[in-house]
């Protein structure tokens, strides 16, 4: 299980998730429990998909941010984050 924290000036969400999928300058990345630690810049307008414990998938769009992942803890921080 991954603990995902989503933070922006107007939003703060904490979710337990199974996986997280994102597009990065290096290509598409799927993060699952035990993934190698990483720190990724997020391009404006990038979207993320993540899967909750119950199998429901959620989509978010981010502007000007980054993703940090280490020890099954993910933190997504952005100037503007929108649930879509």
Language-model features: where?
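Compact, glycine-rich, soluble single-domain proteins
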Residues: 2-84
């Amino acid at each position: 299980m991954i603990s995902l924290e989503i933070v922006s000036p107007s939003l703060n969400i904490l979710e337990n998730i199974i996986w997280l999928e994102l597009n990065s300058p290096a290509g598409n990345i799927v993060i699952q429990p035990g993934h190698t630690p990483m720190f990724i810049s997020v391009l404006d307008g990038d979207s993320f998909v993540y899967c909750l414990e119950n199998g429901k998938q959620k989509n978010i769009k981010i502007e000007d941010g980054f993703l940090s992942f280490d020890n099954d803890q993910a933190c997504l921080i952005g100037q503007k984050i929108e649930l879509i």
